[in-house]
Amino acid sequence: MLFRGSPKERRNFLDINLSKQFPIYLDYISRYEKVLRQRNEILKSEKVDQKLLEASTELLVKYAGPIINYRAMFVKDINDILIKITRTLTGVKEKIEITYRPFVNMSSDYQKEALEAFKRSLDNDLRHKATSIGIHREDISVSLNGKDIGTFGSQGENRLVALALKLSPYFMITDEDKKPIVVLDDVMSELDKDHREQLIKFLRKFAQVFITDTKLEIDGATRIELTKSN
């Protein structure tokens, strides 16, 4: 499940959706990951080259800044959408909030604060021969009525809110010439009858929706069957 799984799953959710909206974001991620690999190789050296380590750290800080800004903007924009979708699917006015936790807060002194954070983590990095902080270790969380849903939410609540979160980016497409195509893989089996009906009703807002399922029947939908051949 999204909120009970690895933080990497949640970072992937951010990165995939931001890359679709902003191609330059993918460029920043690619540059950051390249420098991260280089820094980790330096840390694994028998004799660490301090100048190379310093240079790679400065580059990580440089590329991390725009990534943090994009992630923070995305989470802020998606929060109200997440609330509306969750309430539509559940029919209950729960208090929902998505939170992004950057490795360092953006401010006018971002570069200085980020470099200081890397300096504080240096002993740990050298000991484990890997970069222990940065945008590659960040996470997002969702709270339901003030409590972390991954920790305190029921299995049903986790499934519904995760589904609502996955649907939210489709509502961020404001260009009328771009009609989003919604693709949902085997989500119906995780929902009870009432919530399946609510979801199907909700999905009729979209021009095209593809749902994979082994036995789902939807009025007015075109069914494409795939069979396994011997």
Regions flagged by a language model, labelled:
Residues 7, 32, 49, 53-56:
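Generic alpha-helical segment signature
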Residues 43-47:
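Secondary-structure edge/capping motif, primarily at the C-terminal ends of alpha-helices
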Residues 185-187:
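Walker B catalytic acidic pair
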Residues 23-27, 48, 70-73:
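Alpha-helical structural elements of signaling/regulatory helical domains
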Residues 212-215:
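H-loop/switch region of ABC-family ATPase nucleotide-binding domains
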Residues 1-42:
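Extended, charged alpha-helical "arm/stalk" segments used for dimerization and assembly
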Residues 51-181, 190, 194, 198-206, ...:
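Conserved NTPase motor "head" modules and their coupling/switch loops across ABC/AAA+ ATPases, GTPases
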Residues 209, 221-225:
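Conserved beta-strand scaffold positions in the cores of enzyme catalytic domains, especially
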